[in-house]
Amino acid sequence: MFEGDDAQGIDSVFVLGNGPSRKNIDISKLDGTVIGCNACYRDFTPDVICATDAGIMSDIIESGYDGQCYFTHNSWNLLPEEAYDPLANGTEHTTYRRFDSEYFVYISGLAANCIETKSYIIWVPKGMENKIKNIGEEVLEWSTGTSALHIACRDFTCNDYEKVYLLGFDHHNNYYDNIYTDTEHYFSKDSKRVDGWKAEYNNWDKQIFKVIEEHPALQFVWINYRGDDFPKLPNLFSKDETEIWQA
């Protein structure tokens, strides 16, 4: 199924997962709002970044990224600098505090090896206080990628025949399939899930389909979909990466 002619020449939003199928796509050529996930900042600067793990969020802040952020579903709560001494116990990973930082967030997540848990104190750079929002409890426990798709439709479209592209959403293998596999704050390729990674991916697919069904006036284009079981939804289409820039 391919995208309809009536969708030509309209605004586009690109939601980038971190599956290997997007590794050969030149992100700088994407004409529209680019929403990235987690460690994408290591390779390019998206317009918006979405993250749900504390370790990745601390890395994003320490990288100097100063764009719009959606961090956690409901746990990003600013605390005044006066609360630091009563809370800190010296075991946390604490980000660099600039001289003008007035607020921080105290949050727990996984350590860099994605095995142990770790608490983080994230100092918020001056000017970023209003650029970082919670994703929202309506998609609590969703994956980062599917949460980013939800954000794209809720906050970055007019719900009027705009195109929403999905890139790097690779949900077909039964192993951890990610560009950043075996790096800090990411699982190893041989990591396991109780019911297998495919079961996890199937759940993520259901989240994607829910978003698509909730926005019938938007056209969704899944780039580099792999498999012969393409979902039959009236507003979901497929394209190869070579066709992204074709009318």
Residue ranges and their predicted role:
Residues M1-A247:
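Metal-ion/cofactor- or nucleotide/acyl-coenzyme-handling active-site neighborhoods
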